[in-house]
């Protein structure tokens, strides 16, 4: 019997002056960037957690500790490719990705096509199997005040070649 598994991932990082804003592997022009040990790409971190969780392989912190100097400033696309390798090694393939970025500022919509392209390349997945939505927090809370950005990702994985 074919195994089909669902994963869910979440990440949040604060916005600070002096960092590049990188989401989905796309550098977005803005006066602030996300603070973190790596490049702080909230979307790709949530994606890694969703994929690892679906395969019962732990979470991003287990595989890429924020106390490990090897991951200081690392491009999170490298982490996604490594997670993809782990899933493949475990006998799984990614079926689809559905993601939501929650940011009051800056606007994400113009950058979504590039994010989809990057994720499709890193997971060797057709772009049509990846959906990314952008929402605001309606000026509520930390995100609504422009102090941080959140990403949530749901994924479906399956063993073998067909669902």
Swiss-Prot record:
Intrachain disulfide bonds: none
GO biological process: isopentenyl diphosphate biosynthetic process, methylerythritol 4-phosphate pathway; terpenoid biosynthetic process
Cofactor (UniProt): a divalent metal cation
Binding-site residues for a divalent metal cation, renumbered to this chain: 11, 13, 45
Top-level EC class as recorded in UniProt: lyase
InterPro entries in alphabetical order: MECDP_synthase, MECDP_synthase_CS, MECDP_synthase_sf
Keyword Ligase among UniProt keywords: no
Catalytic activity of the protein: 4-CDP-2-C-methyl-D-erythritol 2-phosphate = 2-C-methyl-D-erythritol 2,4-cyclic diphosphate + CMP
EC number(s) per entry: 4.6.1.12
UniProt keyword Chaperone present: no
Record keywords, A-Z: Isoprene biosynthesis, Lyase, Metal-binding
Cofactor comment: Binds 1 divalent metal cation per subunit.
PROSITE patterns noted in UniProt: ISPF
Molecular function GO terms recorded: 2-C-methyl-D-erythritol 2,4-cyclodiphosphate synthase activity; metal ion binding
Annotated metabolic or biological route of this protein: Isoprenoid biosynthesis; isopentenyl diphosphate biosynthesis via DXP pathway; isopentenyl diphosphate from 1-deoxy-D-xylulose 5-phosphate: step 4/6
Signal sequence annotation: none
Site (Transition state stabilizer): 37, 136
Assembly notes: Homotrimer.
HAMAP family xrefs: IspF
Family (UniProt): Belongs to the IspF family.
Record protein name field: 2-C-methyl-D-erythritol 2,4-cyclodiphosphate synthase
Gene encoding the protein: ispF
């Amino acid at each position: 019997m074919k195994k089909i598994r669902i994963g869910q991932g979440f990440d949040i990082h604060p916005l600070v002056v002096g960092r590049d804003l990188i989401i989905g592997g796309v550098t977005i022009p803005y006066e602030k960037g996300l603070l973190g040990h790596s490049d702080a790409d909230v979307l790709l971190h949530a994606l890694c957690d969703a994929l690892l969780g679906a395969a019962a392989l732990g979470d991003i912190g287990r595989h890429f500790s924020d106390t490990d100097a090897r991951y200081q400033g690392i491009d999170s696309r490298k982490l996604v490719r490594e997670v993809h390798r782990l899933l493949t090694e475990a006998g799984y393939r990614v079926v689809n990705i559905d993601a939501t970025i929650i940011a009051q500022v800056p606007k994400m919509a113009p950058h979504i096509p590039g994010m989809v392209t990057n994720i499709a390349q890193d997971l060797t997945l057709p772009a049509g199997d990846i959906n990314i939505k952008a929402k605001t927090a309606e000026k509520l809370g930390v995100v609504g005040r422009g102090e941080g950005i959140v990403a949530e990702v749901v994924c479906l994985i399956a063993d073998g070649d067909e669902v």
